[in-house]
Regions:
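Catalytic cores of soluble, metal-dependent hydrolases
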Residues: 2-61, 65-82, 121-129, 135-250
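Hydrophobic alpha-helical segments and helix pairs
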Residues: 64-119
Length: 250
């Protein structure tokens, strides 16, 4: 599986997992109109920049401010698929401006506009935030609670009955507890080991055609804090990358 690092902030300069020779780096640091909200010009620039790279790959896409890139990657899939999202936030807000895709609303964009998506499953979202999603949208998405995550039969008995097509997985590390990921957004309470266990269950039951991982921590004025954050996230990224590659080659 190809590994593609999409760099908006330079954060991967502090993470050694990204230094492997087999990893392709895409420098997006000079793009405008892409931070958290992506306007039409930013969207066009991103599409042009990312066009040479495959959607069926493992993508690292910087901080959660750029999670909307998942919408772009899955728009490139020309076959029926199910989308599985690990995120402490449902990312189903309505856009504030017409024609703008956002880090907080991209799931709704996929749900309403992608002709190939058959199911959307969100794992680890806050119950409070789930209930804030408009009912007509919430009813079209399957949510997995923390209790269900801990029960290994939950996937085949619930989601497994729905899915009859390949899956694309999107992981925002803010679904993890603070000890396992330092992000720009509020964290959930899933451990890295729990996340890996659920991913293995998915790989055992489904055909995974692409993955992206977001949730890096943006730069601050505190250099030591940046280094500490990068160290925690580097460990998570390294472990997830190695696990995904091992599942892909098995």
């Amino acid at each position: 599986m190809d590994i593609i690092v999409v760099d908006f902030s330079g954060v991967y300069d502090f993470e050694s997992f990204a230094s492997g020779r087999e990893i392709v780096h895409v420098d997006c640091r000079g793009l405008n109109g892409v931070d958290c909200y992506c306007d039409a010009d930013g969207r066009n620039a991103l599409r042009k920049t990312l066009a040479p790279y495959p959607a069926k790959a493992l993508h690292f896409i910087d901080s959660g401010d750029y999670h909307y890139l998942t919408e772009y990657w899955v728009s490139r899939l020309q076959e029926p698929f199910s989308l599985i999202v690990f995120d402490h936030h449902p990312d189903m807000q309505r856009p504030q401006w017409e024609g703008v895709v956002s880090c907080g609303g991209w799931v709704t964009d996929v749900l309403e506009n992608n002709p190939y998506v058959k199911n959307i499953i969100i794992v680890g979202a806050s119950d409070k935030l789930i209930h804030e999603v408009p009912t007509h949208l919430r009813e079209k998405v399957m949510f997995y609670s923390q209790a269900e995550i801990d029960h290994h039969q939950a996937w085949p008995s619930k989601a497994g009955k729905l899915i009859h097509e390949p899956v694309y997985i999107s992981i925002d590390k803010d679904v993890l507890r603070k000890q396992d990921a330092v992000t720009d957004w509020t964290n959930g309470d899933m451990t890295l080991l729990q996340l890996q266990a659920v991913l293995r269950i998915i790989y055992a039951h489904e055909e995974v055609i692409g993955v992206d991982i977001t949730g890096e921590c943006s730069a601050t004025l505190d250099y030591l804090s940046e280094v500490r954050s990068a160290s925690v996230n580097n460990k998570a990224n390294e472990e997830l990358m190695q696990m995904i590659l091992s599942e892909t080659t098995d």
